[in-house]
């Protein structure tokens, strides 16, 4: 197998792992995400000049899925119930201080939960 094919396979596996983490316990969305990933990889399976860019894009998508996607769950049957977020260990956590000062060099020395 060629190097781009091996990298593409690795990127595809990263996306599958990321979808498993991001959409745990949501079979419908998990299957739809994996189907879309498969469709995109099948659509671009010919090796070309832009292959490294496409592989890099797939790796970035996997990272976003793994670190930035949080799903909300509302208990069934209770309309007054509040939504609960499924936050897992890989989720990137920030705080309001980092958002308020975006683009500036800032060092935050406190924990997010403090």
Swiss-Prot record:
Keywords tagged on the record: Chaperone, Mitochondrion, Transit peptide
Main subcellular localisation: mitochondrion
Record-annotated membrane-spanning stretches: none
GO cellular component: mitochondrial matrix
Any coiled-coil regions, as ranges: none
InterPro entries linked to this entry: Complex1_LYR_LYRM7, MZM1/LYRM7
Subcellular localization, as worded in the UniProt entry: Mitochondrion matrix
One term of GO molecular function: protein folding chaperone
Keyword flag Kinase: no
GO terms (BP aspect): mitochondrial respiratory chain complex III assembly
Transit peptide per record: 1-18
Sequence similarity: Belongs to the complex I LYR family. MZM1 subfamily.
Protein role: Assembly factor required for Rieske Fe-S protein RIP1 incorporation into the cytochrome b-c1 (CIII) complex. Functions as a chaperone, binding to this subunit within the mitochondrial matrix and stabilizing it prior to its translocation and insertion into the late CIII dimeric intermediate within the mitochondrial inner membrane. Modulates the mitochondrial matrix zinc pool.
Assembly and interaction partners: Interacts with RIP1.
Protein name according to UniProt: Mitochondrial zinc maintenance protein 1, mitochondrial
Gene symbol of the encoding locus: MZM1
